[in-house]
Amino acid sequence: MIQQQTLLKVADNSGAKEIMCIRVLGGSKRKWGNIGDIIVASVKSATPGGVVKKGEVVKAVIVRSARGLRRTDGSYIKFDENAAVIIKEDKQPRGTRIFGPVARELRDKDFTKILSLAPEVL
């Protein structure tokens, strides 16, 4: 579960390395986000010459969560880290590459471009 102040790794080549969650979108009292949810985040560290800079406020979609997710068939999927992909306003990724595996649940939430760029879909 991702909440305010959670640090996430960035799983794309947009230039950011680490972001911190400011808000989970989807209601005024929403406290936690999981895989496929959109968050507003601040860039905490970035590579020089990247698209995004340190201190910039961005929107991102959660692609990996250490908490895990229960699927409809009763199985669970859990990752070693919390990771997100920085997106534009039209839900397209700002980077051109995705690093690491992503969950299949992103297809239900219309993030097909992220799924097509990912090296592995679990």
UniProtKB/Swiss-Prot annotation:
Gene3D superfamilies: Ribosomal protein L14
Any one GO biological process: translation
Cellular component annotations (GO), alphabetically ordered: cytosolic large ribosomal subunit
Keywords annotated in UniProt: Ribonucleoprotein, Ribosomal protein, RNA-binding, rRNA-binding
InterPro entries: Ribosomal_uL14, Ribosomal_uL14_bac-type, Ribosomal_uL14_CS, Ribosomal_uL14_sf
Example GO molecular function: structural constituent of ribosome
Pfam families to which the protein is assigned, alphabetical: Ribosomal_L14
Described purpose of this protein according to its UniProt entry: Binds to 23S rRNA. Forms part of two intersubunit bridges in the 70S ribosome.
Family: Belongs to the universal ribosomal protein uL14 family.
Subunit structure: Part of the 50S ribosomal subunit. Forms a cluster with proteins L3 and L19. In the 70S ribosome, L14 and L19 interact and together make contacts with the 16S rRNA in bridges B5 and B8.
Descriptive protein name: Large ribosomal subunit protein uL14
Source organism per UniProt: Clostridium kluyveri (strain ATCC 8527 / DSM 555 / NBRC 12016 / NCIMB 10680 / K1)
